[in-house]
Amino acid sequence: MGSNVYGILTMVMIAEFVFGNMSNGFIVLINCIDWVRKGTLSSIGWILLFLAISRMVLIWEMLITWIKYMKYSFSFVTGTELRGIMFTWVISNHFSLWLATILSIFYLLKIASFSKPVFLYLKWREKKVLLIVLLGNLIFLMLNILQINKHIEHWMYQYERNITWSSRVSDFAGFSNLVLLEMIVFSVTPFTVALVSFILLIFSLWKHLQKMHLNSRGERDPSTKAHVNALRIMVSFLLLYATYFISFFLSLIPMAHKTRLGLMFSITVGLFYPSSHSFILILGHSNLRQASLWVMTYLKCGQKH
């Protein structure tokens, strides 16, 4: 039974890995082509480019972590190796979440229509707002790295003191739980900001539909379509990131009980977010959608010939 579950999870993980690299790689390729051709990118182009890169790094890091843990275990890694693994995960996870949050703020400022002076002030200074959020989140990143480094220093000290394999594994399980809890704490702020942006955009859509109803105009005007498209992308991000968030909690159980199958399941759940959301971004962005349709048409023509 265990071997069958292991085989199924392995196939799902490989599919997520391939699909995630293809969708994120496609976003990187199209935006790089636009960058070379035009000499610059729009705000959303830069956000999508670095978001896709951070997700590709995150996907590769999760896969490498799984392989290393399943084959060698982390009980005998050096401090340098452990820092490399942990810092890569922290940085890629941080930008994967914060850039998606910045994308939510971008949609809110670009599409929502509020008459409040504060919102209008932020809307007129959209690029500055996005830049401030981007620079501000670096403070969270530095704090996160410092905290993780403290945990690594403490674990390495315990590692050198404990000679037996069982005590080292037990220490690493405790260390892993501390790191996961740290990641959960630092993920709350950007997730909350994205959720608030989503709620405000829903409220903006509701007000817009009321206005359309009073003016006896159709509900499928360009503004309504823009609202719905942005909401579709944002709700998919929130739901998929919720699964990624849950995977953190799921990881606490196998780490505490040292079950490799449980850890594999939590990583499979976690991979679903960076692998799937980029595909939704392709469908929701006109340039990316047109490029994907062109590629599909080209491939179909190639098969016929």
Curated annotation (Swiss-Prot):
Receptor that may play a role in the perception of bitterness and is gustducin-linked. May play a role in sensing the chemical composition of the gastrointestinal content. The activity of this receptor may stimulate alpha gustducin, mediate PLC-beta-2 activation and lead to the gating of TRPM5. Most taste cells may be activated by a limited number of bitter compounds; individual taste cells can discriminate among bitter stimuli. Its main location: membrane. Keywords: Cell membrane, G-protein coupled receptor, Glycoprotein, Membrane, Receptor, Sensory transduction, Taste, Transducer, Transmembrane, Transmembrane helix. Residues 29-43, 110-128, 204-232, 284-305 are cytoplasmic. InterPro entries: GPCR_Rhodpsn_7TM, TAS2R. It holds the Pfam family TAS2R. This is Taste receptor type 2 member 13. GO terms for molecular function: bitter taste receptor activity; G protein-coupled receptor activity. Glycans are attached at residue 162. It is a multi-pass membrane protein. It is found in: Cell membrane. It comes from the Eukaryota. Residues 1-7, 65-88, 150-182, 254-262 are extracellular. It comes from Mus musculus (Mouse). CDD domains: 7tm_TAS2R13. Belongs to the G-protein coupled receptor T2R family. One of its GO terms (cellular component) is plasma membrane. The chain crosses the membrane at residues 8-28, 44-64, 89-109, 129-149, 183-203, 233-253, 263-283.
